[in-house]
């Protein structure tokens, strides 16, 4: 990437206490990064494409090592793209395919699921084995198994189930155990990058050629938007849905002593999807000690068209005018190069530590 003159800070950089002390003393080295989380967030991923390109196209390959990539929903799709033989091409292709999607008014859950399956097939293009055998990256896909009414795609029953989830979540996040089981479908060459998971029923499932596509599809299957994935190979019978329902921003007990580098859409870590409107529901500080979070700054966002990153509501906002939405999304992807360029410059000149805020 060629450097862009930075007139205002494009990035907000926040770090947990151990990461902050380490970076301020020794700087940030790619060799120190062992884990990268990827949050759920739909089209917001397009808004940080330039950051992904800088990380996976330039910075991380300069210090090759075994790294865990753990994502929910679009986070898992971003990381699957980065595991393709040409990471930069894969990341750009995901942005192109996502942008080209278009839905008419009244589109059904089945139609959106079918469109997503086609997009996934076009993205992987028969290169599943390359993802599973990537020399440096170990992919972890977050999925939930749904219980009770949430296992049904009938809109009425599913709606009742979601109402029950919302009510239980208000009473306490732990009550979501009644509704969901967490699954991490992971590259069997390396255990998932987390310590013991005691907050919800959780299990690990080996990722392989027989379940890669179903796992990716399930990880992004938002209830009431897409159908759930049935009987995921290796995970047993049942209905499997978006991993972001439980782990929206991956507030997880990360293992090891490496830096957890988190390219994110926002400077907040929100535990679950149902916590988005609950400002008091915050991430656990002890889980963030080794995290370095990179996110678009408020100044950067204010200069984007519509003053924000792309989001799922854009499909409704631009209903009947797909070219305008696509132009907006492409502009946002182009602008996001500033995020990547600023990160590369800060990492290279050793001044990243000066910009760090406490996470």
Across the structure, where does each feature detected by a protein language model lie?
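Catalytic nucleophile serine of serine hydrolases
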Residues: 73
């Amino acid at each position: 990437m060629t450097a862009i003159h930075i007139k205002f800070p494009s990035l907000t950089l926040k770090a947990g206490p151990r990461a902050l002390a380490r970076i301020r003393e020794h700087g940030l080295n790619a060799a120190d990064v062992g884990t990268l989380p990827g949050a759920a967030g739909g089209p917001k991923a397009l808004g940080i494409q330039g950051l992904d390109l800088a990380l996976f196209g330039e910075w991380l390959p300069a210090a090759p090592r075994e790294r865990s990539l753990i994502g929910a929903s679009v986070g898992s799709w971003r990381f699957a793209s980065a595991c393709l033989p040409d990471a930069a091409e894969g990341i750009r292709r995901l942005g192109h395919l996502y942008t080209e999607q278009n839905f008419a008014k009244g589109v059904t859950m089945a139609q959106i699921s079918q469109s997503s399956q086609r997009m996934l097939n076009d993205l992987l293009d028969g290169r599943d084995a390359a993802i599973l055998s990537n020399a440096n990256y170990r992919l972890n896909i977050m999925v939930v198994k749904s219980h009770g009414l949430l296992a049904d795609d009938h809109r009425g029953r599913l709606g009742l189930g979601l109402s029950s989830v919302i009510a239980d979540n208000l009473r306490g996040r732990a009550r979501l155990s009644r509704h969901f089981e967490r699954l991490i479908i992971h590259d069997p060459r390396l255990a998932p990058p987390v310590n013991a998971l005691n907050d919800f029923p959780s299990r690990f499932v080996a990722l392989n050629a027989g379940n890669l596509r179903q796992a990716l599809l399930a990880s992004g299957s938002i209830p009431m938007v897409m159908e759930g994935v049935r009987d995921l190979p290796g995970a047993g019978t049942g209905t499997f849905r978006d991993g972001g329902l439980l782990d929206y921003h991956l507030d997880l007990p990360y293992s090891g002593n490496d830096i957890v580098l988190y390219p994110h859409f926002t400077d907040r870590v929100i535990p679950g999807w149902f916590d988005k409107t609950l400002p008091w529901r915050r991430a656990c500080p002890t889980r963030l000690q080794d995290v370095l979070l990179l996110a678009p700054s408020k100044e950067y966002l204010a200069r984007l068209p519509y003053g924000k990153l792309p989001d799922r509501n854009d499909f409704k906002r631009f209903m009947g005018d797909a070219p305008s939405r696509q132009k907006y999304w492409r502009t946002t992807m182009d602008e996001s190069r500033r995020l990547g360029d600023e990160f590369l410059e800060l990492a290279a000149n050793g001044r990243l530590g000066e910009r760090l805020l406490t996470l």
